[in-house]
């Protein structure tokens, strides 16, 4: 089992009000320059909120929740400090999230 850490908020807050694109762009550039694999994902309407042990988190956010999931607890804690009004937590699962399993291609060319 893998421990996943998450930051959770409404889609409006994270995707419209906060500069999340800038945060992700900086983080991806940092990972690429240090030859690190991406270990965070943006998940709209995360299904892990349906687990019984997640009911307290589910009740804190509207139905249009979005989660940032990572295997790196330091990144999630940093997001909490940077963004502020988000919930953070963790769960264990057999998910094997990776760029390959999610069919993600990271573009390296500047547009």
Curated annotation (Swiss-Prot):
Keywords: Chloroplast, Plastid. InterPro entries: Ycf54 (IPR019616), Ycf54-like_sf (IPR038409). The keyword Nucleotide-binding does not apply. GO terms for cellular component: chloroplast. It is found in: Plastid, Chloroplast. Belongs to the ycf54 family. This is Uncharacterized protein ycf54.
């Amino acid at each position: 089992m893998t421990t996943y850490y998450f930051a959770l908020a409404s889609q409006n807050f994270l995707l419209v009000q906060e500069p999340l694109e800038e945060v992700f762009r900086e983080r991806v550039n940092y990972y690429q320059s240090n030859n690190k694999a991406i270990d965070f994902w943006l998940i709209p309407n995360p299904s892990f909120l349906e687990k019984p042990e997640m009911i307290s988190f589910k009740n804190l956010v509207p139905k249009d929740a979005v989660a940032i999931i990572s295997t790196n607890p330091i990144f999630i804690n940093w997001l909490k400090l940077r963004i502020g009004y988000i919930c953070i937590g963790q769960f264990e699962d057999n998910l094997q999230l990776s760029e390959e399993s999610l069919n993600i291609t990271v573009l390296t060319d500047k547009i």
